[in-house]
């Protein structure tokens, strides 16, 4: 059940969705409360209330993000970062979702394309914008939709979500620890094609170790890595 300022808004408990739209158009401060219904009995949750401030934007919450710095590839090309894929999970067991967000460089590439890419970052934020950690996938994970998928799920059933993704030598976890060989660089330097007067086959990664790593959702620490 959903309440606003103590007034019940739902005729029956919400059971088939994860959202509720309040048709109230007032711009005044409002306190919303979600009360779980278990076995037909309404209960309370310690973190079940949220205060919507006066004149709040409609339809969304603004969450400040920590954008990574721009970069330059070995070929001398510059790139910038923008928010990309995101998922949610309760990483610390407090009953509130956190956001796990991927930062993608502007020079990300598909499998069929050559060229260097910037490094990919995975961040975790609270809803108030507090950054909990950042994972750097490193130079040996190419940026692109086919390379950098991740999963957020409570794998061990402890009430805290873990984060799983493909990693490689040089990936840096949320505690600053490097996975594998920190000095490895498997990116192709490329060859010069006189007929095109340009470098070809640059930046592709066709060799080197690949890993699957489970990270702590709470700290970003690498918990277990397999190859």
Predicted regions and their residues:
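Conserved aromatic beta-strand anchor motif in extracellular beta-sandwich/beta-rich domains
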Residues: 2-4
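Beta-propeller-forming repeat regions
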Residues: 7, 11-227
